[in-house]
């Protein structure tokens, strides 16, 4: 059995609940398809949970792919790390990530910092620029979690089996079987809109809400979306009041199931 989850977005309780339904015995394994941070209130704890899980079972049984939110977080860290190492502020600063986080009540950054460190940032935020806040925050996070940051940096962008490609957003399907040779990070991490139709391998991805007009076109739809051909999309809107989905692939039967509350429901093409 191959399990898959995506777009956990800081929701540790939902992750732990889903993992109670996962059996990693025998040849079973699980693939996490990115976006573990932001929006929810437990981003660090989600990352730590996955890191510990992978250390326990190994990288072959627990595959942790990178999502666009992890990459934005890393871009922000790297930009301000360069400011310190170069001794100059003449560089392009990546403020999109931290501005978005502050819009959500600093839900992510606060989980990486102690209360004392967060109080300090809130204090200087009254008079200092976002650049100053970022410089201080990055130094604190690197000091606290250098090994964890390295682990996030090493996350692969896709996982491939003989018949499947697990990825956060998608691949360049126009390239056919040569998709990996010209695959850009932007496509793998941020492809939009979601692709439907026939491909030579099955694509399992997250990144999007399956309720979107490009997929189910139904605001109430928060299940795995199967286009009836080559694409399974795991809904990415748990933080909006949806549910964290668990997909399971039976390698012997070649069938996909949505696992919920201990029950496995066969994934039919959307609309059937």
Where do the protein language model's features map onto the residues?
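Feature recognizes metal-dependent phosphohydrolase scaffolds
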Residues: 1-272
């Amino acid at each position: 059995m191959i399990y898959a989850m995506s777009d956990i977005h800081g929701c540790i309780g939902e992750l732990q609940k889903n993992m109670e339904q996962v059996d990693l015995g025998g040849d079973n394994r699980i693939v996490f398809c990115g976006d573990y941070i932001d929006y929810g209130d437990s981003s660090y704890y989600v990352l730590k949970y996955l890191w510990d899980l992978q250390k326990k079972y190994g990288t072959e049984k627990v595959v942790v792919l990178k999502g666009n939110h992890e990459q934005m977080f890393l871009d922000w860290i790297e930009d301000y790390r360069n400011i310190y190492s170069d001794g100059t502020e003449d560089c392009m600063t990546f403020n999109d990530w931290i501005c978005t986080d502050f819009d959500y009540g600093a839900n992510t950054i606060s989980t990486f910092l102690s209360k004392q460190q967060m109080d300090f940032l809130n204090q200087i935020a009254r008079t200092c620029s976002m650049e100053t806040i970022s410089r201080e925050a990055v130094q604190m996070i690197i000091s606290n979690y250098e090994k964890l940051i390295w682990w996030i940096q090493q996350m692969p962008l896709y996982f491939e089996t003989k018949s499947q490609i697990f990825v956060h957003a998608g691949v360049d399907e126009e390239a056919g079987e040569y998709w990996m040779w010209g695959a850009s990070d932007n496509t793998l991490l941020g492809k939009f809109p979601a692709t439907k139709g026939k491909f030579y391998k099955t694509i399992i991805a997250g990144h999007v809400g399956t309720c979107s007009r490009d997929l189910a076109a139904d605001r109430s739809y928060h299940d795995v979306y199967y286009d009836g051909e080559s694409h399974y999309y795991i809904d990415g809107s748990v933080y909006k009041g949806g549910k964290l989905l668990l997909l399971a692939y039976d390698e012997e039967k070649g069938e996909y199931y949505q696992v919920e509350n201990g029950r496995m429901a066969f994934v039919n093409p959307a609309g059937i």
